[in-house]
Amino acid sequence: ISHAHYDHIGSFAKIATLAPHAEILATQDTKHLIEVQLLEFGRISGREESERVKNERYRQAQTLLSRIQVRPVMKTFQMKGCKITLLPAGHMIGAVMIYLETESHRILYSGDFSVKTRFGLNGMRIPGGIFPKVLLLNAPNTYLDADEWQKELILVQSAQREGAGFTEGAEQSGLEPIIKRNLAQNKRVYLISKSIPKNLDLLYFLNEVFPDTPVFLEPKSRKIADTLADMGY
C-alpha cells in the first residue's frame, strides 16, 4: 500500500477479500492511518447503510489490518525472489515508492508523490545507485502542468546523477492571501479539511504562515491533531 489517502484505501478491504492469500505490505505510519480512518473515524461505511452492512465492512477492515505487514523505509528486504526497498515518496505521512529488483528486472513504482518539501514533510527521495529499467509513476496527482512537470523531472534526474535526494522549500498556498484579507477585516476564518492526513498539511501551513494567529480546533479536528501528535508529527 503506497500511502493512506482515502482514495487509495477506501475499497482496499473489499479488494483484499478477493485475494485472501496475498501478502500486504505498508509502512507503520500508513498502517496506523488506515486504522484511524477506516475504524476509529468510521470512513469504511456510508451513513445510509444498514447496521448489518456496516458491521460486515468493519469486519473486512479489521481482517485487512491484521494482514498488513509493516516494513521499514530505506532498508532492503527479500520476498519471493525479489529484493524490495521502500523509498520516501513525500506527498503525505508514510508514503513510499517501491523499488523491486530481480535477476533480470529493476522496477521503481510510485503511487502519488511530491517532489518538493513542504510544511514539514520531506519530498521524494531516490538515493544514488538506484537506476530502474522500468519506471511506473502515478503522475496525474502531482498537480503540475506539462511544462512544470518537465522542469521538476529534470531536477530530480540531476539530483539522482549527483547521488542526492531532491527537496525544495515549502510551496505557497492559495489560502494565504484569502486568510490575510479576512484577518485584515477582523473576520474569523473557518477552514474545513475532509481528509484526515491532509489535516497535517493544514496545521503545518497555519503554524508556518500564521504563527501568531490563534487557531481553535473542533472536537473531531482536535482528535485528529492528537492522533498525529502521538505519531510524532
Would you name each region that the model predicts?
Residues I34, N199-D230:
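Terminal amphipathic helices with adjacent charged low-complexity linkers/tails
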Residues G46, K54-N55, A225-Y233:
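Acidic, Ser/Thr-rich peripheral helices and adjacent loops at domain boundaries
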Residues S2:
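P-loop NTPase motor catalytic core
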Residues H5-I9, K14-P197, Y204-F210:
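His/Asp/Glu-rich metal-coordinating catalytic cores
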